[in-house]
A protein has these predicted regions:
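Short, well-formed alpha-helical segments that are part of the catalytic scaffolds
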Residues: 12-27, 50-57
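Conserved catalytic core of nucleotide-sugar-dependent glycosyltransferases
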Residues: 113-221
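Active-site-proximal specificity loops/subdomain of glycosyltransferases
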Residues: 46-100
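Hydrophobic targeting segments
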Residues: 1-7, 23, 35-39
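Active-site donor/metal-binding and catalytic loop motifs
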Residues: 228, 247-257
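Acidic donor-binding loop at a coil-to-helix junction in glycosyltransferase catalytic cores
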Residues: 227-236
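Short beta-strand-to-loop acidic/aromatic patch adjacent to the donor-nucleotide binding site
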Residues: 101-111
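Active-site beta-to-alpha loop of glycosyltransferases that engages the nucleotide-sugar donor
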Residues: 6-20, 43-47, 83-86
């Protein structure tokens, strides 16, 4: 079984439709894969409050008819101001299934490769590990180890004065990390990327679509940590435990920062 979990804050809801459409498309592309979905709708206003006259419930209401919300595989958790402060690091620390093949960290701003669940279903790695999907070129070269194989070779950050031939700014949209990529653009790019290739890489974690194999000791995020840098905390954990990271270098995720 694969557990896909995602935490949505009320102020992120403009991105939910695209996120859920993408998850649903990946589920439909792999109909025989056993997948459970766990979604947290976080209505807390401890950090930010809606504009005067707006209600937090209104931000979520238009999404409640979505097919993913009604899917029998989907479980919903709701957090409100009646609960103690709770955020994405709490969710990621708590929602991990030690018996699942993978627990996947979804993100509101991230769309999936169409064959995402099919790949996870087919992969067979007989040891504890973390699997990630390739990203677009980031703000510095340290991220090249988890960058898609077709998007390598650009100098980062922008250094046009000394890197006129390979400056990151020469890469066309939407293939830099700061560009917005649509599902159609992502699907086309991945369709043109050939066979699935998986390689062990040096540890480098960004929180979107991290796929954590079953069997890890918990907690792997510090108790009491609520949000910000929980992915870095997890990277420190797997480094210390020497748990290998592998990357699907030929499949791009759509992390729209």
């Amino acid at each position: 079984m694969i557990l896909y979990q995602v935490h949505h804050m009320w102020y992120e809801t403009a991105m939910i439709q695209e996120c859920w459409d993408s998850v649903l498309a990946a589920l439909k592309a792999s109909p025989n894969t056993d997948v459970k979905i766990e979604i947290c709708l976080n209505k807390q206003t401890y950090v930010e409050k809606p504009n005067e006259g707006s209600k937090v419930d209104d931000f979520f209401s238009k999404h409640l008819d979505h097919s993913l919300f009604k899917d029998p595989r989907t479980s919903i958790t709701i957090k409100t101001d009646k609960d103690p402060f709770y955020n994405i690091a709490d969710w990621r620390r708590e929602v991990y299934d030690v018996k699942a093949k993978y627990t996947v960290w979804g993100e509101t701003d991230t769309i999936l490769p169409r064959d995402f669940f099919a790949i996870l279903d087919l992969v067979q790695i007989d040891q504890l590990h973390v699997l990630t999907f390739a990203g677009r070129p980031m703000w510095d070269n340290s991220w090249d180890v988890v960058t898609h194989e077709r998007l390598q070779g650009y100098s980062k950050p922008c250094q046009c004065d000394v890197h006129k031939e390979d400056c990151i700014e020469l890469l066309e949209e939407p293939f830099k990390y700061k560009d917005y990529i649509t599902q159609a653009e992502l699907d086309k790019f991945n369709d043109e990327s050939g066979d699935v290739k998986i390689e062990q890489v040096p540890w480098k974690i960004d929180g979107s679509t991290v796929c954590i194999s079953g069997g890890l000791e918990t907690p792997f995020i510090a108790p009491g940590m609520h949000f910000v840098r929980e992915d870095t905390c997890f990277e420190y954990y797997i480094r210390k435990k020497k748990i290998p990271q592998v990357c699907v270098t030929s499949r791009l995720k759509g992390h729209n920062y």
